[in-house]
Amino acid sequence: MTHLLIVAIGFIIALPAQVFPGEADVTGVEVRQTASRIFHFDVTVRHDDSGWDHYADKWDVLAPDGTVLGIRTLYHPHVDEQPFTRSLSGVEISETISEVSVRAHDSVHAYGGKTVTVALPR
């Protein structure tokens, strides 16, 4: 009986993590230079979108000091497309910056998921 109770409590504790989406994670970043100081980003995001009430709604390109260099708004949930990749072109980045970080945002938790840092090709 004690064993059954422990299993039931474990299931109840673990259930919300599987039923409710967590934070949005960046799982991949590809970047290429398209012109002098201009870059194109292909970013893969993973988030268990549940619909319009909770979904990954944007990702940002950040300088090492935290300055936002580019924002890719995601206009709808990706419930049946996980992970998903979206692009952002025309991101101007100073020659003094050698790497950037990409973070994702969701409509409930804001930021907090996995961030990826990449070196800029020059």
Per-segment meaning from a language model:
Residues 3-14:
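Bacterial N-terminal signal peptides
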Residues 15-21:
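Sec/Tat signal peptide C-region and signal peptidase I cleavage site
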Residues 22-57:
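Short, surface-exposed binding/anchoring microloops in extracellular/periplasmic proteins
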Residues 26, 38-40, 83-87, 99, ...:
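Intrinsic-disorder/low-complexity, polar/charged segments enriched in Ser/Thr/Lys/Arg/Asp/Glu/Gln
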Residues 58-62:
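Beta-strand signatures of extracellular beta-sandwich domains
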Residues 70-99, 103-110:
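Short, solvent-exposed, Trp/other aromatic-anchored flexible loops in extracytoplasmic proteins
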Residues 111-120:
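Edge beta-strands of extracellular beta-sandwich domains
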